[in-house]
Amino acid sequence: PDRIAHHIRPFWHAGKQVNVHVTDDLGVDAVLDAVAELLDEKPRFDHRTVLHHFGISTQAQSRRAAALGCAVQVNGYYLRYFGDQFVADGLGTERASLMTRAGSARRNGMSVALHSDLPMGPLQPMLGASILATRMSGTGVVLAPEERLSSYDALAAVTIEAAWQLKLDHEIGSLASGKLADLTVLDADPFEVDAAAWPDIAILATVLGG
């Protein structure tokens, strides 16, 4: 952990964006310590450092990450496919519920996006967004309901927030004058449908580079 800043330093000082995979609270501390050290060396006010997975974290870490200007990119499939197993055989209910704390991240002002980690999870954005909005395990247990995202934030996690983290929000991620008309036409309004049913919404058309 004490070498993370060493490895990131040349990219940081060159003005590059940093993306780090981190899955537990010890790892989160190590990455945040490195970001704090590098910010002291070379302040950067739009560095958009992204913590991928953000698996197990604390409220204090979420607040600190936000204060340091970090973003998180989470994988809700851990909740769906491994949540029950983590509760029963590994972490227990309390600690397993700390996985993928997207709700806290948003409340603390961080950008939250979603990835599938293919082949760990499928390339199904509506399913991924649904899991972040419901936090339902495979057996239907809701893990830490306070960490659910709103419908808006869950859908933003696969659109504008993902674009922002890629530094492509000036081109894609939302419909606006001067941006590409990338869009998907659905057969139902996800804001009028329960988030648990989002995976069942049919895709009628997709426009790319419009």
Where are the regions a protein language model picked out?
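C-terminal accessory/binding modules appended to enzymatic or scaffolding proteins
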Residues: 4-6
